[in-house]
Each structure stands twice: as C-alpha cells, then as structure tokens.
C-alpha cells in the first residue's frame, strides 16, 4: 500500500511539474523561472543517484542559471546541452527540461550514464524569458541588467506599448514618404521591401509596436533589458551591437558557461538548442586564404570563419543522422553567428558543436487558387509559408492589421499587426513532449558517437638481454575522432596523451616518455607507438593512455618475452 501511495505521489508531482498545456493558452505547458527550478529539484530528488542540479550563475534579475549533471562521475566523456540563451525561444528551455526527465527514466539510462556524463543548461537567459509569462507579452532579448541602448544617458526609458490592448507586442505600419515597405500583392497582410529595380516605390515604415516615450523620434529603441546572452560569446562578437553587451562574456550567464567548459575537459561535444543550426544544413567548410595565401587562424590569415575541411565529413554525417532520426529535411535559415554559443564552442573551444532551431512552423499547404500562387522568385517565401501555416494551424499567431484610434505618426494613421510575439519560435504546450523525444533521441545518439579510446593492444618483444621492445596500438572505437581538427589547432580540449611510466633501475632507450596524439580517426582508427626499454626480466612498467573527453586507461605491462 505504501508503494502505491508513493507511485501516486510521483505521478502527481510529475503532473504538477509538467502540465499538459491542454487548456489552449499560449503559456500552458511552459515553465517560468520559479517553476523551472521546482521541476528540476523534483527530478533530482526522485533520481538522486543519477541527477545533480547546481546553480551555474545568477542573472541580474536574481534568477538562477542551472546546470544539470546526469551521471555519477565527472571524469567520464560528456556531452553538454545548452538551451535558452535567446530569451524569446522558450521551446529550447522546455525541450532541455523534458530531456532531463526523459533521459533518467529511459530504458538503459543507468548503463549509459555509468560510462558517460551529460550536462544540461536548460535556461541561460532566465530574465528575458520571463516576459513570455507577463501581462504584456513581448519578445525581450536582454537580461535585467540596465543598459543605455541609445546612448542618451538614460537607461531603459523607451519600452514597447500595447496600443491595441491585446496583451502582445507586434509591429506598427505607417505610411511615409521615406517608407521602404509595401503590402504583398498575393498575401496583403505580409509586408515586403519595395524593389526599386522593378519600379516599386516604398509606402510604409515598419516599427515595433509602441510610442516614442522619450521623445527622441525613435520607437522602443531603449527597451528594458541589458545583454542578450545569445550574442555575448567570444566568436565574432560585435562591439556596440544590439544587446551584445560591453564585451565578450560581460554577462555573468555567458561567462559562467565559458568557465564551465574551460574547467571540464571531459566535454567532447556540445549540442545547442538555439537560433543557429548546422544539422538541417551542415556547416560548409572551405579554405579561406588570407594575405599571401596564409591559412585561417594565423596573424596573416585572420580568424577562423569557416570549419576546417578535415572536420567537414563528420559534420555532414552527423547532419545526415540527425535528419534521419528526426524526419526533418528542411527548416528555417540559421541566425547569424554573432557572439553565439554554437560557433564559440567549435571555433574557440575546439569541440564538435551541433545546433538545432528546436521548432518552427511546418510546411504550409500549397495554395493554387487564382491570384494566390506565390511568385517563382519569392523574396518572402519563408514569411509567406509561416503566415499560411499560422492561418491554418494557429490563427492567433498572426494579428491582422488594424488601425489604432488616436495614434498618428507624422500625421498618418498607425496600424498594428503582424506575427504575434513568440508564435514563430514556440509550439503549443501540448506538442512539447513529442518534440522533446526527437531531440532526446539525437542526444542519446550523440553520446554513442563520442570518441572511445580503448585500452591499447600491447606486444612485448625481447630484443636482447634485459632489452625489450614494447609496441602499443591505440584504437578509437567511437564514431567521432579523438579531437576535431579545429581542436588540434587550438589545443582544446586536451589531446590523447600516451605516457610510459618506468621505475627505478629501468631505462627508456628509445621512444618518448610522454607524447600527445593530434587526432585518432573515429570508427576504428589506430595509432601505434614503440619504446625500447632496458629493465630486469619480469619487471613492470605502466602505460597511461587517453584524454578526459575520450576515455582513460591504465595498463600494467610485464617485461618478458612473449
């Protein structure tokens, strides 16, 4: 009877932590910062042998940034999952949270986590995400650190305003002589830039919904919020960029991730649930010569801007496996790699890094009615698809343009409309569990792809009195190489180390006591080493092989003829 009550309590706790989202409100099934913390704590308490939850950083808004460790040992090869860096993309955090839940209760979880570790950061930007749950819902990007975006010596003084009273922030359009936008001929609710080469003249200005609260002629240019964590990492950082922060890692949230990766050499691969993608469309590496043909990554060649060609095959194959596993063959274009965590993990930290956009509107049914066929060269093909998908599947996801009584700009009537806040990035809560299954399956597959340095095959040959040749063949039984080519260049993470330890009275006649291997190819790739030792018969030496992210082994070798 006690067991029945215990199971019932667990079921009730799970229902409270993960509501179904069946009521139909946009926030149903999603967790604000407080409920996210509670859900993680409940999972950790129920699975204390497998799950540890720690606070990685605290945001300016005093909200925790958690890191979840799945698996009992830090020294095992690991995958790091990063989510929630872009505030409006709540779906990434929800998938990461449910991934924690699903990984610990999956069949074979204990066995997988005995040999591997998975780190998950569910929500890197908790401050920005909170506007999803507010009375006024708007896509905030920056954390709670105040910042003077428009450099007028005042912080956060021009926030969005809900002009039509619907509780969400969309866009404003207003006719203007200097307008750059026109209504689309096929779908008039959509706006596109006028093409002067086709004789088109702009009619409208497009602005974020709101008033000019600080009377400087700009609208919502200094909204509440400081640093966009998804733009505060070191690769391709833009100084003075929108919400990018004062300098790379100026935000506690991003700096904590950098410190975590730097101190965890066991992280072999990174999976980013965010706005950048290299799985639907793999990164295209190319040689980009600099001055005098100098390679990237040198003073003359400049910084790395493309994956190294030696890594391309691995990215292509992982992309193929991801698409086969998820059933996704196409998706939205990746966001630019400006200070983002995905490109940073690869270019700066030397890890194989993979990214997914998490969720996006599906393919809309073709509309072949008269006057509804899109042009062959469609400049707004993506927006058109999203609009038609919303009309069929989520009508509230697009707000039709309507005039706002009493709101004029330069004597012209203001209309409000466009895609609803959060609609393009977050599905209904009822879809989150099935969405998580796809991403969890990929993470499980990624763990299986990690490099695996097996205990070496050793042969000992007596070549003379008290003289022995030791030959060791090291094999990588994982799919991925022991280090990415970019990691060999950056020397991050640690390369496979081969160390021969000898004792008193023993002498190393040839071969190096310690050496590093740049990269051992995956899928059974090997590397051979030889030493000649002078030692007493039947004495022993010790061979240490491996790296924190590819596995470590220690072998005692007896020096006798074989």
Residue map of PLM features:
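Bacterial N-terminal signal peptides
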Residues: 8-17
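Short glycine- and acidic-rich boundary segments immediately preceding or forming the N-terminal edge
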Residues: 23-61, 430, 434
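Metallocarboxypeptidase
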Residues: 52, 64-65, 82, 94, ...
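Active-site/substrate-binding loop(s) of hydrolase catalytic cores
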Residues: 76-77, 90-94, 98-303
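Short amphipathic, basic-aromatic surface patches that mediate peripheral association
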Residues: 474-489
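Short, hydrophobic beta-strand segments
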Residues: 529-537
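Short, aromatic- and glycine-rich surface loops/edge beta-strands on solvent-exposed regions
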Residues: 538-548
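Edge beta-strands of extracellular beta-sandwich domains
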Residues: 551-561
